[in-house]
Amino acid sequence: MQLIANKTAQYLIQNEYHQVSLESDFLVLSSRGSEERIPFNVWNGKVKLKRGLFWGGLQFFAHPEEGKQQSWLIQGLPWERCRYFARLAVASYQKWHHHQCVQLNKFLPEWEMEVRGFERQPAFLNHSTVNAWLEKMNRDFLTMEMTLEDALLRMPDRMSEILPWIDDTDEVMATRNQRWMVTELENWKVLFSQIESSPLNLSQQQAVLLNDDNNLVLAGAGSGKTSVLTARVAYLLQSHLAQAEDILMLAFGRDAAEEMKQRLENKIGLSAEQVTVNTFHQLGLKILNQVEKDPVTISPIALDDNLKNAWCVDWLKKHWMTPTAFKRWQKHLQKWPIAYLAGDDELGSHVENPKLIAWLNKQLNQLSAMGCTKKEIQQRLVDHNDYTRLNSELALVWPCYQAWLDMLKSEGHIDFNIMITKATQHVMKGKFKAPWKYIMIDEYQDISPQRLALVKALCQQKDERNCVLFAVGDDWQSIYEFAGADVDLTTGFAERFPHSTIHHLDTTYRFNNQIGEVANQFVQQNPAQLEKVLQSHKEQKAKAVTLAPSNTVEKILDELNRKAKSSQTVLLLGRNHYHKPELLSEWQKQFALLSIEFMTCHASKGKETDFVIVLSVDEGQFPARVKALHIDGALTQSEDTFPYAEERRLFYVALTRAKKKVWITYTGSGSSFVKELTEQDYPVIVKK
């Protein structure tokens, strides 16, 4: 049915609506030259009759939005038919509304049951469970040809229970899981009080109970991450969430893996005997040996740095015997020196130069780790400001990479990088079926893109097994970019793993609050670092960080030795090996109550000591001078553009090795780090 104004009325009302009709679930309004279709889910079902001197009008209303209500007025209509049309339109709307409610009533009870099930579930509620329900709801809405907004308008009271789970999913889940956690903490208080020599604190206990699809526990220096990993294994086993065979623990070094095995044996015992504790290399080898017919052999050359360097020397000697290759190197080095070498006539005498060979080995390792074609590498580099130089470098080292692959193939061997890549491919193709339901990674901040690809492949195998990733690490201590680690994989965890929960351990048992205040404030100057609170268990009012001239190191040691009532440990930390003091051996003999050791800041990671003296925090030394990026650096460069980002994290690592006091020594006015600590609001002592 339709109503239309006569020609006189149309002339008088100009461009206003002059015609209305009903068409299926729409009101169709027409004016001169245009038509508007108003669906019933936009109209609120109300219509107002308006009587004029000669004609009638109908006003239809939309649902109110933010306190405002839109309406549509059709004028110049024959009055005697307006009431009938209005009744017919309202009846059509009510029929449509009833049909929508009947449709909703088919699905609502199931939705309500799911939501109530979320609340009652006696376990951590993970994102994948809720997301599966949300996806099903979307399919239900498509089946009903209805939107969420329609459902809210049809049955607002019934939908009020469900709406928060749709609009504020993460917040509602977090609140629900927090309520569950309160009960679960009480259930497991005996385990948490006895698994270590001291009871776990609340943030550690909460970390143990996390069971989202992907979990990241940010564990600041000295916050007890190892205790969390051990307690989590005990919790999974004792709660029957997992059998020992369901758990894989990954570490980055053989020593770390052995230490973890020993802890499981000491703290949990036989029930944890079948937990798999591997390095990434052991895991890769396990996968390859299970999938491939022939035994896999790692090249002896790849296993030994000295043999690898010797291989690089041998290759370079042969390569430079080809005039075109030698000239290519000369031409490049004349424009862009490498390892302080220029392309002069004496270049041939540098074929065994340790720095040049170390550089070549580093580029070879990076190309091998990526496993890309030359064209793919060029695509990765093409937007770099130094593309011309980097592409020229690639031309130098690509033949070395090809020779390396040829050597491995002829010997029937592989290297670690090929092993990780092949293992990942086997998992992705389904040739290796992962038996694990829980994958736990220690020192996650040290992970590289290649290793993460293997972990993701294991977690994402499509079968009935839900695999939970539990990563423990600290982006503040990510200091191994030169070895392929990518801090962005930690700071971007939530973006990389959308179904995730991030939690942080809030108490350090290593250093006092005075060291903590300096170190935590310093590392968080970089806004790319994940923000977290790290309180110190030990509190004191006296400042514990002192800046002093480099020539006072012996005086500091003498004072510590005189005040010591028992043996004390002292770490002398340098940015590089050449910062090792010449008098170290004398000091070790001279100060009997001090156990003095020198380390680079990198080597000190994971260590703790009574006192730390950071040496030579001078301009160009610490932070180290920014050097031109080579292929390895350009291919692994972090997206973080904050000045000296990794050097700042390295300085944080150095400061947080100490339990009691830190001295930062420098010459002259020191580096930018010294200036920042002395000129900005840091609780430090400055000695002249």
State each model region's role.
Residues 294-391:
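ATP-hydrolysis module of ASCE/P-loop NTPase motor domains
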Residues 1-20:
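Anionic N-terminal interaction surfaces
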Residues 449-542, 685:
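Conserved RecA-like helicase ATPase core segment
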Residues 22, 26-53:
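Phosphoinositide-dependent membrane-docking surfaces
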